[in-house]
């Protein structure tokens, strides 16, 4: 609270950035230790978590007041007009401090209290068991074993304690390969295809320098290849663009030639002492020693494949360009699509999906194992491995399975959530929408295969909400070792049980578990299959959304059908009792009920599309009255909906 200078400002205006007639709402702005709260004249509340705030901008003073623009990590943008410049300045400075915490203990998760006891908290963390997940895949088995080499995080600090490696890989091979790979991230198992034992493995790039090689690393890759009895060759998939890597390799060769020439001159110069010669050569070698990719001459039975996904800096720039297009008011159709194309965002989404498709085809069609890496193996590698597994295994397309997939390929294998999401006040160049891209790829798959996923779009959006909210401990920290040091399981709560408690909200009414059980997804990545995810990037701009949702109507119809089936069963049971001769006055009335006695509505229009449930907030930071799943009946009767809201139920979902 020491950062809050002004706790309450009245007569603040909230503008609609897409309104054609500059409509606004007038209300009171509050600052709390965790939230910014705006209450309009109709007592409608808008909550914004401080951790969601990406940037705050105070614009030049106008005749109507001082503008304050807040951009959030969940792509919400709010534009306030504060009457007095002094109040605006105080709010601005407070938000700058509150949105950028210096240490983990100051994040919301460490103070959030859902009123659970320690046992309930522990049960929530134990909901996802990765050891059980590997057992589901049939591991350990004759070809794969659980290694304890990283039990104390001595082999690789950013990997989990439990690593699955080929049974023929000895401890010296594991340690030697780790020393040869960037950040010590050696090749380990991510996914094993049941029945064929073709595997998806992951690692970081090798420290190959000019011509360096590592026998232990070569032996480990050979062991991975032999662990697949169905195919003796394997793919090494480098997710980086080939042209950049070729340019890097050419540069290394040029530097190598220079070193050879210089070293030759040094050795021929008798005036230079031997110690100086060694120092200079070592210095030049250290400067030239780089990181690269595997030399096919040193690795037998591998096939090399580049898939061309750009780095975190390109992705951050691409998203920024996309958001600039989204925030532009009054763009023509041509200008919007031109800006969307110029951002390159959908092109990057396609590149990630194409890489995952290559993995799936290699395993299904060629029965070949695949080793995936990028630079350090925690960004592009996580994207490709998780999406490849999603295409191959229908379990990951269930709600529980998707949670397991995120825990396995993202959280346990050290995707740097806190750095990529900017949880703390750190280097802005480390922030990048890597996980957002993953969720968007999954959304595109749900659009192409609407019956294949148990969860709906709301589930993906809710997860995206909480990677930035810092309300739960799942996404805090950059690796498992760091999370253990923070004692997150003792001090914070897991997100997953809260999502499962509201499972009904996130169910896909089109899901067919029987037809999808053994299906491998084969998405089409032609350009016409990619579209702008409006419900992600404009989820809070309600004026841009249609009034009804086909999926919500289907969900209501399903609920009605279930209720009708229960009514039919009740009536059949009572009719059966009547036929057996047991007839009472109450039973007779039940067999011939009045029309209103049926539990289901005779007319769909009589019911709201989504019922209001105030028992649990869908997103922490919204009041029950402002829940995303609120009924819009009252709002629809107005000339124009409210400007900013956390809702998206009926008004968001489109067919």
UniProtKB/Swiss-Prot annotation:
Allosterically activated by phosphatidylserine and/or phosphatidylinositol 4-phosphate (PtdIns(4)P), and phosphatidylinositol 5-phosphate (PtdIns(5)P). Interaction with MTMR9 increases catalytic activity towards phosphatidylinositol 3,5-bisphosphate. It is a peripheral membrane protein. Residues 2-141 are annotated as: Interaction with RAB1B. InterPro entries: MTMR6_PH-GRAM (IPR035998), Myotubularin (IPR030564), Myotubularin-like_Pase_dom (IPR010569), PH-like_dom_sf (IPR011993), Prot-tyrosine_phosphatase-like (IPR029021), Tyr_Pase_AS (IPR016130), Tyr_Pase_cat (IPR003595). Pfam families: Myotub-related, PH-GRAM_MTMR6-like. GO terms for biological process: endocytosis; phosphatidylinositol dephosphorylation. Residues 1-101 form the GRAM domain. A 1,2-diacyl-sn-glycero-3-phospho-(1D-myo-inositol-3-phosphate) binds at residues 286, 311-312, 375-380, 420. One of its GO terms (molecular function) is phosphatidylinositol-3-phosphate phosphatase activity. PROSITE patterns: PPASE_MYOTUBULARIN, TYR_PHOSPHATASE_1. It is found in: Cytoplasm; Endoplasmic reticulum; Cell projection, Ruffle membrane; Endoplasmic reticulum-Golgi intermediate compartment. Residues 124-537 form the Myotubularin phosphatase domain. Its EC number is 3.1.3.95. It catalyses: a 1,2-diacyl-sn-glycero-3-phospho-(1D-myo-inositol-3,5-bisphosphate) + H2O = a 1,2-diacyl-sn-glycero-3-phospho-(1D-myo-inositol-5-phosphate) + phosphate; a 1,2-diacyl-sn-glycero-3-phospho-(1D-myo-inositol-3-phosphate) + H2O = a 1,2-diacyl-sn-glycero-3-phospho-(1D-myo-inositol) + phosphate; 1,2-dioctanoyl-sn-glycero-3-phospho-(1D-myo-inositol-3,5-bisphosphate) + H2O = 1,2-dioctanoyl-sn-glycero-3-phospho-(1D-myo-inositol-5-phosphate) + phosphate; 1,2-dioctanoyl-sn-glycero-3-phospho-(1-D-myo-inositol-3-phosphate) + H2O = 1,2-dioctanoyl-sn-glycero-3-phospho-(1D-myo-inositol) + phosphate. The modification Phosphotyrosine is found at residue 108. The keyword Repressor does not apply. Residues 547-581 form a coiled coil. Its main location: cytoplasm. It is an enzyme of class 3 (hydrolase). Keywords: Cell membrane, Cell projection, Coiled coil, Cytoplasm, Endocytosis, Endoplasmic reticulum, Hydrolase, Lipid metabolism, Membrane, Phosphoprotein. A 1,2-diacyl-sn-glycero-3-phospho-(1D-myo-inositol-3,5-bisphosphate) binds at residues 286, 311-312, 375-380, 416, 420. The modification Phosphoserine is found at residues 595, 623, 645. Binds with high affinity to phosphatidylinositol 3,5-bisphosphate (PtdIns(3,5)P2) but also to phosphatidylinositol 3-phosphate (PtdIns(3)P), phosphatidylinositol 4-phosphate (PtdIns(4)P), and phosphatidylinositol 5-phosphate (PtdIns(5)P), phosphatidic acid and phosphatidylserine. Negatively regulates ER-Golgi protein transport. The GRAM domain is required for cell membrane localization. The C-terminus domain (aa 540-655) mediates interaction with MTMR9. Belongs to the protein-tyrosine phosphatase family. Non-receptor class myotubularin subfamily. This is Phosphatidylinositol-3,5-bisphosphate 3-phosphatase MTMR6. It comes from Rattus norvegicus. The lineage of its organism: Eukaryota, Metazoa, Chordata, Craniata, Vertebrata.
């Amino acid at each position: 609270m020491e950062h809050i200078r002004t706790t309450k400002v009245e007569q603040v205006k909230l503008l609609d950035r897409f309104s054609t007639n500059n409509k606004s709402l007038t209300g009171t702005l509050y600052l709390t230790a965790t939230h910014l709260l705006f209450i309009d004249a109709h007592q409608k509340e808008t909550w914004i978590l401080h951790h969601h705030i990406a940037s705050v901008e105070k614009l030049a003073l106008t005749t109507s007041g001082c503008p304050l623009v807040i951009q959030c990590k969940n792509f919400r943008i709010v534009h306030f007009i504060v009457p007095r410049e002094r109040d605006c300045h105080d709010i601005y400075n407070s938000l700058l401090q509150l949105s950028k915490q210096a240490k983990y203990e100051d994040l919301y998760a460490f103070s959030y209290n859902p009123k659970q006891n320690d046992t309930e908290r522990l049960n929530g963390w134990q909901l996802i068991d990765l050891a059980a997940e590997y057992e589901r895949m049939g591991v350990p088995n004759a070809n794969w074993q659980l290694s304890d080499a990283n039990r104390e995080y001595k082999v690789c600090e950013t990997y989990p304690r439990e690593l699955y490696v080929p049974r023929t890989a000895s401890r010296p091979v594991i340690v030697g390969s780790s020393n040869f790979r960037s950040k010590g991230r050696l090749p380990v198992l991510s996914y094993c295809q049941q029945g064929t034992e073709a595997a998806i493995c992951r690692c970081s790039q090798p420290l190959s320098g000019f011509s360096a090689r590592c026998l232990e690393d070569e032996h480990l890759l050979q062991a991975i290849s032999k662990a697949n009895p169905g195919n003796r060759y394997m793919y090494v998939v480098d997710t980086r663009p080939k042209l950049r890597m070729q340019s890097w390799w050419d540069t290394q060769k040029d530097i190598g030639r220079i070193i050879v020439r210089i070293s030759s001159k040094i050795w021929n110069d008798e005036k230079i002492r031997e110690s100086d010669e060694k120092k200079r050569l070592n210095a030049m070698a250290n400067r030239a020693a780089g990181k690269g990719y595997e030399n096919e001459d040193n690795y037998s039975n591998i096939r090399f494949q580049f898939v061309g996904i750009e780095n975190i800096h390109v992705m951050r720039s691409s998203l920024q360009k996309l958001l600039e297009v989204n925030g532009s008011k009054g763009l023509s159709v041509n200008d919007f699509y031109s800006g969307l194309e110029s951002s390159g965002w959908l092109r990057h989404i396609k590149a990630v999906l194409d890489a995952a498709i290559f993995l799936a085809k290699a395993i299904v069609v060629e029965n070949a194992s695949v080793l995936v890496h990028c630079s350090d193996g925690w960004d592009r590698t996580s994207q490709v491995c998780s999406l490849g597994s999603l295409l191959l295994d229908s379990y990951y397309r269930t709600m529980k399975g998707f949670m397991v997939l995120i825990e396995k390929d993202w959280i346990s294998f050290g995707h740097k959530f806190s750095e990529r999401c900017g949880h703390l006040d750190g280097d802005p160049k480390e922030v990048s929408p890597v996980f957002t891209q993953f969720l968007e790829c999954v959304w595109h798959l749900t659009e192409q295969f609407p019956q294949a996923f148990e969860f709906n779009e709301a589930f993906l959006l809710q997860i995206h909400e909480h990677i930035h909210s810092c309300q739960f401990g799942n996404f805090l920290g950059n690796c498992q070792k760091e999370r253990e040091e923070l004692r997150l399981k003792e001090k914070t709560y897991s997100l997953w049980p809260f999502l499962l408690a509201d499972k009904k909200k996130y169910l896909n009414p089109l899901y067919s578990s029987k037809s999808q059980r053994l299906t491998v997804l084969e998405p089409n990545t032609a350009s016409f299959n990619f579209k702008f995810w409006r419900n992600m990037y404009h989820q809070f701009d309600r004026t841009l959304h249609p009034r009804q949702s086909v999926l919500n109507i289907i969900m209501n119809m399903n609920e009605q059908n279930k209720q009708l089936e229960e009514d039919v069963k009740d009536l059949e049971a009572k009719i059966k009792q009547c036929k057996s001769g047991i007839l009472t006055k109450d039973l007779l009335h039940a067999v011939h009920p009045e029309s209103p006695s049926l539990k289901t509505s005779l007319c769909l229009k009589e019911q709201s599309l989504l019922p209001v449930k105030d028992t649990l907030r869908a997103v922490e930071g919204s009041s029950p009255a402002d829940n995303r799943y609120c009924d819009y009946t009252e709002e629809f009767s107005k000339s124009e909906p409210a400007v900013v809201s956390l809702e998206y139920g009926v008004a968001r979902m489109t067919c």
